[in-house]
Regions:
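The beta1-alpha1 cofactor-binding region of Rossmann-like NAD(H)/NADP(H)-dependent oxidoreductases
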Residues: 25-36, 64, 175
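Active-site loop-to-helix junction immediately N-terminal to the catalytic Tyr of the SDR YXXXK motif
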Residues: 62, 106-115, 127
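Conserved glycine-rich Rossmann-like NAD(P)H-binding loop of the short-chain dehydrogenase/reductase
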Residues: 1-12
Length: 205
């Protein structure tokens, strides 16, 4: 198992030691770096793309360079990583991209670019599923809603606003998302491809 990280090298190395995996620092905005990372990882059975950033603010006032960086990380990186991984995958490989329920629903202002980037992943999965299907390689998107992480803690300032949109009024847990990813990576999901798998407590319902 190889995973990449951007910051927090100490946390990455701890995780690598605990799991017997290899941590590689990488910039997901760097196309050539993303391609090299996948290429240098050797033969791949499963690729999980989990890099992403968000921007908040009025679209009329946002910095164009920041928007371009968001698109490089949230759209270009998953595309190039997926294509490069497919070159190295055996028949029956798995590509799983972590998107967001905001690809389906954006109920608040100030996140147009983020929502666009997550909607783009839906087209990526549908298109690459057609391209890679003859080799039995599946391509799916997991679309979490609010998940209790350092980036979006349940006790954060957005809790009440987000929970008002949800049927299950709590943040999801990382292990719930991981369970969906593990199922998609397994043999039971060999006929599941080009699909969006939303895990959001009905945030998008």
């Amino acid at each position: 198992v190889v995973f990449s990280y951007s910051g927090s090298p100490e946390a990455a190395e701890r995780l690598a030691a605990e799991t017997g995996s290899t941590a590689v620092q990488a910039d997901s905005a760097d196309r050539d770096g993303v391609i090299s990372l996948v290429r240098d990882s050797g033969p791949l059975d499963v690729l999980v793309v989990n890099a992403g950033i968000a921007l908040f603010g009025d679209a009329l006032e946002q910095d164009s360079d920041a928007i371009d960086r968001l698109f490089r990380i949230n759209i270009h990186s998953p595309y190039h990583a997926s294509v490069e991984a497919a070159r190295r995958m055996p028949e029956g490989g798995r590509i799983i991209v972590i998107g967001s329920v905001n690809g389906d629903r954006m109920p608040v202002p100030g996140m147009a670019a983020y929502a666009l980037s997550k909607s783009a992943l839906q087209g990526l999965a549908r298109g690459l599923a057609r391209d890679f299907g003859p080799r039995g390689i599946t391509v799916n998107v997991v679309q979490p809603g609010p998940i209790d992480t350092d980036a979006n803690p349940e006790n954060g300032p957005m809790k009440e606003l987000m929970h008002n949109f949800m049927a299950i009024k709590r943040h999801g847990r990382p292990e719930e998302v991981a369970g969906m990813v593990a199922w998609l990576a397994g043999p039971e999901a060999s006929f599941v491809t080009g699909a969006m798998h939303t895990i959001d407590g009905a945030f998008g319902a």
